[in-house]
Amino acid sequence: MSDRVCVGAVAGAFGVRGELRIKSFCAVPEDIASYNPLSFEDGRETTLRLTGQIKNGLSGRLTGVSNKEAADALRGARLYAPRDRLPRLPDDEFYHADLIGLAVHDTGGTLLGKVAAVHNHGAGDLLELRGPGLKGSVLLPFTRAVVPTVDLDAGRIVADPPEGLF
């Protein structure tokens, strides 16, 4: 497990004075600023100060960003928080970052693939699986009925996929 977790991303500039559109991946979107200092993928640290709520996200300022050009240059940049600053999760909840890369086996032990991404389009989380024998990606509902076991220490997920999915 990484010592950093992606908690948001820069969606682009907001205005001409260096404000940014921030997409928070936190359960409570405004909590993203409470995990300061944040860092970029390359490890550079920054501090986020939220300035308001806007359509599809938040507006805010990052240290060192003072104009639209600097804000535009950060479009798509991911923001990371130190894992030890994040709340401890109950046993049946997981950070998406911890699921990516885990091997997924069916209840008979056959490897189905590895988790490539975790998506949520409003109706619940979906695990995107890729692997040998799959023509492309397969989306597996991340529910207790379909995914009864997640063992982070062993790097393994046991799934009971719906009939006909594989």
From Swiss-Prot:
- What Gene Ontology cellular-component terms does the record carry? cytoplasm; ribosome
Q: Which family does it belong to?
A: Belongs to the RimM family.
Name of the molecule in the record: Ribosome maturation factor RimM
Tell me one GO biological process term: rRNA processing
Q: Which InterPro entries match?
A: PRC_barrel-like_sf, PRC_RimM, RimM, RimM_N, RimM_N_sf, Transl_B-barrel_sf
NCBIfam families given in the database record: 16S_RimM
Its quaternary organisation is: Binds ribosomal protein uS19.
Specify the PRC barrel domain's residue ranges.
Answer: 91-165
**Any idea what job this protein has?**
An accessory protein needed during the final step in the assembly of 30S ribosomal subunit, possibly for assembly of the head region. Essential for efficient processing of 16S rRNA. May be needed both before and after RbfA during the maturation of 16S rRNA. It has affinity for free ribosomal 30S subunits but not for 70S ribosomes.
Q: Where in the cell is it found?
A: Cytoplasm
Tell me what gene encodes this: rimM
Q: What is known of its domains?
A: The PRC barrel domain binds ribosomal protein uS19.
GO terms assigned for molecular function? ribosome binding
Keyword tags: Chaperone, Cytoplasm, Ribosome biogenesis, rRNA processing
